[in-house]
Swiss-Prot record:
GO cellular component, one term: cytoplasm
Compartments where located: Cytoplasm
Protein name, as recorded: Dynein axonemal intermediate chain 3
Disruption phenotype: Deficient mice shown no overt abnormalities in body size, development, behavior, or fertility.
Gene that this polypeptide is encoded by: Dnai3
UniProt repeat feature WD, residue ranges: 398-438, 480-536, 702-741, 745-785
Gene Ontology terms: biological process: negative regulation of Arp2/3 complex-mediated actin nucleation; negative regulation of cell migration; positive regulation of osteoblast differentiation
Presence of keyword Cytoplasm: yes
Coiled-coil region(s): 869-889
InterPro entries named among the record's database cross-references: Dynein_IC (IPR050687), WD40/YVTN_repeat-like_dom_sf (IPR015943), WD40_repeat_dom_sf (IPR036322), WD40_rpt (IPR001680)
Tissue expression per record: Strongly expressed in the testes. Detected also in brain and lung tissues.
Function noted in UniProt: Acts as a negative regulator of cell migration, invasion, and metastasis downstream of p53/TP53, through inhibition of Arp2/3 complex-mediated actin polymerization. Via its association with the multisubunit axonemal dynein complex, is potentially involved in the regulation of cilia function. May play a role in osteogenesis of dental tissue-derived mesenchymal stem cells.
Keywords: Coiled coil, Cytoplasm, Repeat, WD repeat
Length: 923
């Protein structure tokens, strides 16, 4: 808004005269000229295309490099000023044009913008004449200049003059750095008693002495504020918004109901209408359209809203911007006085909200030997934790020693197999207690809608008393592992193997075999079915039975029955009674270190997982179908009268043909950080005839510590994640050139890891400082996408679990025996569009990169071999000299000898003048 004009003095009214004076003010302003550059007669102008056409001075047409000026009549310029007024481009020089004495003004085209604009006007007659006719220097004046003698330069020494301040010293002072505070002065001296004593210096660690090293780290200045330069403020005067409503008062309430029913045809009318020609013709006409519509409904949903499907699901529990794991619940065994750590974690396959952990005493081997008597008083347990009761375990499974690994049977979750620290395998059967833990899941009368909202907030009811359950079978101590079992897996129910490692079809349809690895450098395969006895063994058994009966003929049958019943406790199921203390491995595999007599020490292994087992945790439609299929099979086992594990029969692999095209290779991680890809098939030694393991297909020393995790991706069966030491690696099966991804050394040692169950490019890594690194291959491949602190001690195990498409949990176990249940945020549980194909493309690109590196390596090695051969050839080549060259060399050598002889004789004063002869003349 323009400011108001000031009022006229003495209250005079503003009239037209004053307005005219105000309008004439801008015309009286002097136009801009080039007086500062020494040309006061030049006035720069900007001529638009319209003006150039009016005065015929168009650029590159009328005005060129040869013709750079034009004479314009004064009358034409004044006419243009009168017609276009202030719009005219000559308006800034209106005063100059009017006062110009001549009839024509000179307009010059300024192509190089020497004076800032594209044209300039010469406002004086002298300037016009000087431009059109520049003064020429006569030749007579130029010639004497050539003969003028140049001035001789005389050096004048500088003389000091008084300094005149022009303001530059202020700028120098502003740019200079000056100390604002006083310096702190320290005086360090020795004791007076040590004056004059010899001084000896030595190295000292700054961290070992208190207050020996003080670090001054940088930090952001809190007092720094950014001044606000501009601010947009809007104001509007409106009335306040008011909410008003009206409602008719219901003075006399009255209950009333109305019911409608359709009018129906009678039986006669129905028969007549059904036989009518119009109805038949109608069905004949529309039958084709109805069939097409039904086919379309079978092919695709024609009523789907594609626009809504472009967006991702909004109905989630957390915020999409939240990327951190949230603590949901934690479990700690408060009843055990011994300090224990969690060694293994597994979610129940069918009961949501039930998680099982194994605990072990935090003692070394020497400490275990010293405290062996105390350890016998504390039972080794598997704890069943429920979200409804975080204090009391629901079940506690006893074992002969601490369990370091266990796994649920995929065919029947009531069967659990575990590996002990003493090398024994333990089997539990909790079928008799299945109702107890299933009732915990339902938690009384609860609706389906309630179970989907903050889950597992259940009343513990009468489940506060923990129940101890004994194992039903353990393996033989003499024939099993000698050291701690580090990993255990159930073989898929689709196949079984024999003692040679050959693969056969498993027609029983249930999981009957296990594989274990131990620190005693062995990998064992186990079969839970009874072995079929041979004829000789049966005869020996019958003979032994006869001898026993003869020796115990004095005992009555009743006493014998009592003795047999005493050996079997009443609370132990007889499912695997045939294995107890007599269970032997089906085959034993040792990974030899080549020429030496030592063997590799396996810590983790990964078989070729069955797709039905590895994809059961997905959230897509096929995953839901597979999960429902597994649950239906388990339900059929429960409803059937006979459990298939109650009446196990010996395998029929001996009468079947082996499967030839089955992949029998698997990954093994060792204690030295090696990743081995080997075959479990055995071969006979040609010298000794004994069964031996095949040579490993490939061996890589990637990790600088023991391998803690080997796991296949739930989305790509040939992609394997390995965690050990200070780094992480991702491998692809059948790719022998190396890992697809190998991270750099982390800040702390890695102790656990697991793939995400719903995002193919995400995996979780646990560290020894209690942090969890979350890797996202689509975001970063050189470092974790984010890192979050979970506890203050080492993380020992990580296990995620998907409850529904909206909620996902991850269990993190630590060294102090605490199990942390964390809720995974929306961004880490929901894959992006085409994430599977994007991650697959990344792996394929890395495979091509490895192939290229291998090709370059082979080419470089071949180049080195070729260069070595060429060097050998050059050295072996003998240079043959000609006769003339040999004579010339001898001549030079003889002449140098004569010169030396002459110099020696001359130095001794025995020199004689003699004619020098050549070497050829002397001969």
């Amino acid at each position: 808004m323009a400011p108001k004009p000031p009022k006229s003095p003495k209250g005079q009214k503003k009239g037209k005269k004053n307005m005219k004076q105000q309008l004439l003010v801008p015309e009286e302003e002097e136009p801009m000229n080039m007086e500062s550059m020494g040309h006061p007669e030049i006035y720069p102008l900007v001529l638009t295309t319209k003006t150039q056409e009016i005065f015929n001075c168009r650029v590159d047409e009328d005005m060129t490099d040869e013709q750079t000026y034009k004479l314009i009549k004064k009358e034409d310029i004044l006419a243009d000023l009168q017609n276009r007024a202030a719009v005219s481009d000559f308006h800034p020089v209106k005063k100059i044009v009017r006062e110009y004495p001549g009839e024509e003004l000179l307009l010059v085209y300024d192509k190089d913008f020497k004076y800032g604009l594209n044209f300039y006007l010469i406002g004086t007659e002298d300037g016009k004449e000087n431009f059109l006719k520049p003064p020429e220097v006569p030749e007579e004046q130029e010639e004497p200049k050539e003969h003028v003698q140049e001035d001789v330069y005389v050096y004048n020494p500088p003389v000091s003059k008084p300094w005149v301040s022009l303001g530059s010293e202020k700028e120098i002072e502003e740019e200079s750095v000056q100390e604002s505070g006083k310096r702190v002065t320290y005086m360090i001296s020795r004791k007076r008693s040590e004056f004059g004593a010899p001084v000896t210096f030595s190295d000292q660690n700054a961290s070992s002495v208190k207050d020996a090293y003080i670090e001054c780290t940088s930090y952001p200045e809190k007092n720094y504020t950014l001044s606000q330069v501009e601010k947009d403020v809007g104001l509007q005067v409106i009335a306040e918004v008011k909410d008003t409503s009206t409602q008719t008062k219901w003075a006399f309430p009255k209950n009333a109901t109305t019911q409608y029913y359709p009018r129906e045809f009678s039986e006669e009318e129905k028969s007549l209408i059904g036989k009518s020609k119009s109805l038949v013709d109608f069905f004949n006409n529309v039958s084709t359209s109805v069939e097409v519509a039904l086919q379309q409904n079978e092919i695709m949903n024609t009523f789907i809203d594609d626009w809504k499907n472009l967006a991702e699901e909004e109905s989630t529990f957390g915020d999409k911007t939240d990327t951190h794991l949230k603590e949901y619940q934690s479990f700690t065994d408060l009843h055990n006085t011994m300090e224990k750590m969690i060694t293994c974690v597994s979610w129940h396959p069918t009961i949501f909200g039930l998680i099982v952990v194994s605990v072990a005493v935090r003692l070394s081997y020497e400490e275990r030997v010293q405290n062996s008597g105390r350890l016998l008083l504390q039972p080794s347990l598997l704890l069943f934790w429920s979200f409804s009761d975080p204090i009391h375990p629901q079940l506690m499974l006893e074992s002969p020693d601490d369990i370091f690994c266990f796994e649920f049977c995929p065919s029947d979750p009531n069967i659990i197999a575990g590996g002990c620290i003493n090398g024994q395998i333990v089997l539990w059967d909790i079928t008799a207690h299945a109702d107890r833990i299933e009732n915990i899941k339902t938690g009384g009368h609860r609706s389906k809608k309630t179970s989907l909202k903050p889950m597992f907030l259940l009343e513990p009811d009468s489940n506060k008393e923990s129940m101890y359950i004994r194992h039903c079978a353990v393996s033989s101590i003499e024939n099993g592992h000698r050291k701690v079992i580090t990993d255990i897996h159930w073989l898929p129910d689709s196949f079984e193997i024999n003692r040679m490692g050959s693969v056969f079809e498993n027609r029983s349809g249930i999981n009957c075999q296990l594989v274990t690895c131990s620190a005693d450098c062995t990998i064992c395969f186990w079969d839970i079915r009874p072995q079929k006895p041979a004829v000789t063994a049966a005869a020996a058994a019958s003979a032994a039975t006869t001898a026993t009966n003869n020796a115990n003929s004095q005992q009555s049958p009743v006493e014998k029955k009592k003795e047999e019943n005493i050996d079997i406790p009443f609370d132990v199921p007889s499912t695997f009674l045939h294995l107890d203390l007599s269970w032997k491995p089906l085959s034993r595999l040792k990974l030899s270190k080549g020429d030496t007599s030592l063997d590799h020490c396996p810590t983790k292994l990964s078989l070729g997982e069955d797709p039905f087992l590895c994809k059961i945790q997905g959230t897509s439609s096929i995953h839901i179908i597979l999960r429902d299929k597994m649950l239906s099979q388990i339900k059929m086992v429960k409803t059937s009268e006979i459990n298939p594990y109650q009446n196990l029969e010996a395998g029929i692999a001996n009468i079947l043909k082996p499967i030839e095209d089955f992949c029998t290779k698997f990954f093994v991680g060792t204690e030295e950080g090696e990743v081995i890809y080997t075959d479990w098939k055995m071969e006979r030694d040609s010298d000794t005839g004994r069964l031996m393991a095949k040579k490993p297909v490939s061996l890589y020393t990637v990790h600088d510590g023991a391998v803690h995790t080997i796991q296949r991706s739930p989305f790509f069966n040939d992609i394997v994640l390995t965690v050990g030491g200070w780094n992480v690696a991702i491998w692809k099966e059948e790719v022998m050139t190396g890992p697809l991804l190998q991270t750099c050394c982390g800040p702390k040692r890695y102790t656990a890891g697991h793939w995400s169950l719903t995002r193919p490019g995400v995996f979780y890594i646990g560290r020894e400082d209690g942090n969890v690194d979350i890797w996202d291959l689509l975001e970063k491949t050189h470092e974790p996408a984010q890192s979050q602190n979970i506890c203050i001690t080492m993380i020992t195990y990580i296990k995620p679990w998907t409850f529904s498409s909206k909620q996902q949990f991850i269990a993190v176990a630590d060294y102090y025996g605490t199990l942390h249940i964390l809720e995974i945020p929306w961004t880490l549980s929901h894959p992006s569009l085409n994430e599977v194909s994007s991650v697959n493309y990344y792996f394929e690109r890395e495979v091509r990169h490895l192939e290229y590196v291998q090709q370059r390596k082979e080419i470089r090695e071949q180049e080195k071999i070729d260069m070595a051969l060429e060097l050998v050839k050059k050295k072996a080549k003998i240079y043959q000299k000609t006769k003339e060259q040999m004579e010339a060399e001898l001549k030079l050598e003889y002449e140098s000898y004569l010169d030396l002889e002459k110099s020696v004789l001359f130095a001794l004063g025995l020199s004689k003048v003699s004619e020098k002869k050549s070497y050829l003349d002397s001969h």
